[in-house]
Amino acid sequence: NFPSGGQKTMSDENSGNAIDPNTMSIIVTKGSLDWAYPPFILGTTAAAMGLEVTMFFTFYGLPLLLKKMDLKVTPLGNAAMKMPMMGGHMVMPNIVAAIPGVDAMASKMMKNLIKKNGVASIEELRELAVEADVRMIGCQMTMDLFDYQKDQMIDGIEVGGAATYIEVATKSHINLFI
């Protein structure tokens, strides 16, 4: 039985596929500045707490493994986006995203806010993940689809497909889709 009361259906304890309570897997599907933080914060925190962490980067999350990143944020589709300004919070309506240069401005504001508040950059968090032995897998299909080469990626990543992730996920206690 799982702690939630569910039943194991894939295997039993003796088959070698038992769920390890000290494991976490994360599917990383988004690569914008704001969406890059949750998987790296959760992954590095879990690793620091002694969990074995695997991150599977696919589709728009795959560029987070590139040696050179140029992360941006946009108000488009970010209805909850409010930037601290002049003692309050400035709402960034979706329509504003249609104005040329707004994404660049929003990205610069967000990067300044991150730096001002002493929050680690994505590059720093990614390096922490490497140092903490977080297993990072780039999706082979996505690499092929978007014409990425492994030499464009940071050192130490693996390349694998959905089956590689599923093998990890079926043994992980915590599975996140971000």
Q: How would you describe each model-predicted region?
A:
Residues V53-F59, I137-Q140:
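Short internal beta-strands
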Residues I26-A36, L65-L66, L113-I114:
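Short, glycine-rich nucleotide/cofactor-binding loops
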Residues V73-M110, I114, G118:
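A glycine-rich helix N-cap at a beta->alpha junction
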Residues N1-T9:
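Short, Lys/Arg-enriched N-terminal segments with co-localized hydrophobic residues
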Residues N175-I178:
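Short hydrophobic/aromatic patches at helix-to-coil boundaries
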Residues D103-G160, T164:
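A charged, amphipathic interaction segment
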Residues Y37-M49, M55:
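Histidine-anchored nucleotide/phosphate-binding helix
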Residues L62-P75:
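N-terminal beta-loop-helix "entrance" segment that forms/cooperates
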